């Protein structure tokens, strides 16, 4: 229900701002923590026939839903369903794969004004170009929310509308707000749920901006803020808690004690950091070294961090974990740095870099405390070599 609302609202705001399919898919893709398929490519995979049936069902049954009218299909979707342009299962939907005169595969995009297919064009927005080099998703979201171009306006309007809608669905579809975030992450592949995004933008500040823009958060949100509760989630002793609207207090998320979320530990359990790595206290006498570089590649800062982690662990702790909560464990050595040294024919620096890495691996292998690696995703080159040297891989 929340996901379909988000899609239908995107249709509405897209038409209001005069955006096209390529532009919306760039705004609603990986830059904001959504799947690469974004909005329209996802619909092609799912099928517009499925979208039509679900939206129709929500419209018919949601007689008390304040956003009921939004679930009525726009004309372009009705036309596409009538023509059987329902997505991948029909070989065409919002996108269509074809071949040009030379036999080369070409992706065409549907022009929703003419209902004709046109060559796919790269969407260009100054704000999105600024976001691209920013690694931290939370920073990207904050930057886009303040952007003054159409991408920023689209993000604000769709976010404010979504925040209003999900706040009104508590406790109708869920007693606990964290379950809505869980559902959007698991069902739609979002990295962050609506309430998590709201927290990033600032619960109080965003509620005020929503009101100014004509969106009204649910009463329980305003009551929460009036009581001095400034966020939907909080971290207590390294464990995340959610705001419970019935008791008006923060409660622990059931099962959260079985997982270690490094982001939740960073505020209170940070022991040491540099620009490429962070050392955190996991409790029970265990340290964790977390890589913080692009794709967690290994450069000088990461090597320094690993040596510092071993030094600290051998002195005051019982063990060390090498792990992170990123998409990949490590893409290996920082090849950009290697390439730069090779291009400059600075072989002394290159040799020193290799030697330092190898010495660090041997230090991991023969350290006085147990070292455990927790690989996932890409574990390439130096990342793999690290796993081969530690005492245990989990």
Language model regions located:
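Short, well-ordered beta-strand core segments
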Residues: 371, 393-394
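Conserved divalent-metal-coordinating catalytic cores
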Residues: 385
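Extended, composition-driven regions rather than compact fold-specific motifs
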Residues: 331-333
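N-terminal glycine-rich phosphate-binding loop for ADP-containing cofactors
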Residues: 1-327, 336-356, 362-369, 376-379, ...
């Amino acid at each position: 229900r929340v996901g379909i609302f988000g899609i239908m609202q995107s249709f509405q705001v897209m038409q209001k701002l005069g955006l096209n399919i390529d532009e919306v898919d760039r705004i609603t893709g990986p830059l904001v923590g959504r799947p690469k398929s974004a909005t329209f490519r996802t619909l092609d995979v799912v099928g517009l026939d499925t979208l039509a049936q679900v939206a129709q069902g929500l419209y018919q049954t949601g007689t008390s839903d304040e956003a009921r009218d939004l679930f009525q299909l726009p004309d372009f979707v009705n036309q596409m369903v009538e023509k059987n342009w329902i997505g991948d299962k029909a070989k065409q939907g919002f996108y269509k794969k074809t071949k040009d005169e030379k036999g080369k595969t070409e992706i065409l995009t549907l022009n929703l004004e003419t209902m004709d297919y046109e060559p796919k064009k790269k969407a260009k927005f100054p704000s999105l170009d600024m976001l691209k080099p920013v690694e931290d998703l939370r920073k990207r979201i904050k930057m886009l929310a303040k952007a003054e171009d159409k991408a920023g306006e689209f993000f604000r309007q769709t976010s404010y509308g979504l925040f209003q809608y999900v706040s009104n669905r508590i406790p109708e579809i869920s007693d606990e707000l964290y379950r809505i975030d869980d559902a959007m992450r698991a069902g739609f592949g979002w990295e962050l749920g609506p309430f998590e995004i709201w927290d990033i933008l600032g619960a109080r500040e965003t509620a005020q901006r929503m009101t100014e823009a004509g969106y009204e958060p649910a009463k329980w949100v305003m009551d929460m803020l009036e009581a001095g509760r400034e966020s939907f989630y909080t971290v207590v002793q390294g464990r995340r808690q959610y705001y419970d609207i019935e008791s008006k207090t923060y409660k622990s998320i059931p099962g959260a004690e079985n997982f270690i979320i490094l982001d939740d530990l960073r505020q209170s359990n940070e022991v040491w950091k540099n620009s490429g790595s962070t050392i955190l206290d996991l409790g029970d006498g265990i340290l964790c070294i977390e890589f913080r570089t692009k794709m967690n590649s290994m450069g000088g800062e990461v090597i320094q961090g690993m040596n510092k982690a071993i030094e600290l662990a051998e002195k005051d702790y019982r063990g060390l974990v090498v792990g992170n909560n990123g998409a990949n464990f490590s893409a290996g050595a920082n090849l950009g740095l290697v390439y730069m040294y090779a291009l400059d024919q600075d072989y002394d620096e290159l040799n020193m870099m290799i030697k330092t890495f190898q010495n660090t691996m041997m230090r991991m292998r023969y350290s006085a405390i147990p070292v455990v690696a927790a690989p996932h995703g890409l574990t390439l080159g130096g990342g793999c070599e690290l796993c081969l040297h530690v005492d245990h891989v989990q």
